[in-house]
Amino acid sequence: MNIIVTANTVPFIHGGADYHIEGLIEELKIRGHQVESIRFPFRFNPDSELVNLMAFCESQNYTCPNGKMVDRIISLQFPAYGVNHPNHVIWLMHQHREAYDLYPNDPTSEQTVLRDQIVDYDNRTISAAAKVYANSICVSERLQKFNQINSVPLYHPPYAWKQFYNQESQDFIFFPSRLEQLKRQGLLIEAAQHLESPVKIIIGGSGGQGNAYQAKIDTLDLADKVRLIGRFSEQEKFTYYAQCLAVFFAPKDEDYGYITLEAMLSSKPVITCTDSGGPLEFVEDQVTGYVCDPDPKAIARVIDKLYADKQKAKSMGQAGHRKYHAANVSWDNVIETLLGPL
């Protein structure tokens, strides 16, 4: 097939979304398809930038650009899914959450106008697609709740999924993620002051909250318990996963979350929270990890439990590894689904 993948690009910001986009393109090419990607430059302010980009995307028809027939469009992100094609499949990473679950309680009149424009755009363009998939149950439920649009959850593997491995655990908890408020590294930092065990905390990644988190560590006198290691290589990532006692991943209402899957591929238990969204689709309390309240003391208690019973920690990690493979999280399934009959 001749396939176009549409998505966004944000200069100088690279993360899980890029792995998702690039992974899909690579897997399509491996299977012999001709693939082009069209990535629209995304700017979230001023508001006029979003409005203009929505209008531009919706004006694009890729049925036969420059006389070249396109068999299928696969769109991944807002507002890139506004493009037109009769065989258009949307595989939704997430919508523009600031117009939905992250919409402020006391919006300005400008925010209300923009929100209405985005909701109208989503209702119109997503409904026009031949098929709609979501990258998790969480995203699918959000789309149904706010837009009354049905979608089918479709899981995919994390980047370099074959390279994760397991080693004997050491006494540290690993949390790799962007340092942002929604990822809630602060919960784990605050939990460290309540630990009774000698377990250390290693937090990897960079982001806008880096200085604030370091200040919190210093203020709480936790320099001997918590380390911010900043950016790390892929090989370092695999090693941290392989050697940790457990992985902490408790964002607020996460869309999907590669970190959960990476931990399971490394046969490590996952600590998450009751309001974390995507991770809850894989983490079963006391089976593949722990699901606790988003409270530092509750988090500290389960970390101490893991230290006190390392055999149980190992068993939960192995259960997570089995659960991952039982869920058919594979690119074969993804490609077969996205290119199936419409």
Question: Could you describe each region identified by the protein language model?
Answer:
Residues 108-132, 140-141:
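Membrane-proximal helix-turn-helix segments that form the acceptor-binding/catalytic region
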Residues 285-286, 290-297, 305-310:
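Conserved acidic donor-binding segment of nucleotide-sugar-dependent glycosyltransferases
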Residues 214-232:
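Nucleotide-activated donor-binding/catalytic signature segment of Leloir-type glycosyltransferases, i.e.
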Residues 158, 164-196, 202:
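Conserved donor-binding/catalytic core segment of Leloir-type glycosyltransferases
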Residues 298, 305, 312-327, 333:
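A short, well-ordered alpha-helix in the C-terminal region of glycosyltransferases
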Residues 269-273:
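Short hydrophobic beta-strand element within catalytic cores of glycosyltransferases
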Residues 200-214, 230:
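Glycosyltransferase donor-sugar binding loop
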Residues 252:
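Aromatic "clamp/platform" in nucleotide-sugar-dependent glycosyltransferases that forms part
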